[in-house]
């Protein structure tokens, strides 16, 4: 599958988010998820990434956001939100099964678009009123 660039490790600084993580105006669970995806997308665009696709659905999985770094690296982004950090919080909620589904979906997208670019898997987590960007959160070889 895709390969990571050497300099892709590290985490972003937490960004203050509205005190209430769950916007009431979104209503449904799907609406709330879409609101968080929009917030994550805007944050990543301000950080210099460009949107390639959103809510990519392929057999077996979905990718919340596909972004592109300035150097061409494809960034597959999982957006997670939790009202509190009980049970490990938002980022910890991405288990082995979820990572496998993300990898399958990313591989299908990557292959469909030519498969030439480096890529990585990031997580944008909303937790306790904060946005945390976990760059290179996991790799294809440690998903299982």
UniProtKB/Swiss-Prot annotation:
It comes from the Bacteria. Signal peptide: none annotated. Pfam families: UPF0102. Residues 1-28 are annotated as: Disordered. One of its GO terms (molecular function) is nucleic acid binding. Residues 16-28 have a biased composition (Basic and acidic residues). Belongs to the UPF0102 family. HAMAP family: UPF0102. This is UPF0102 protein BURPS668_3819. It comes from Burkholderia pseudomallei (strain 668).
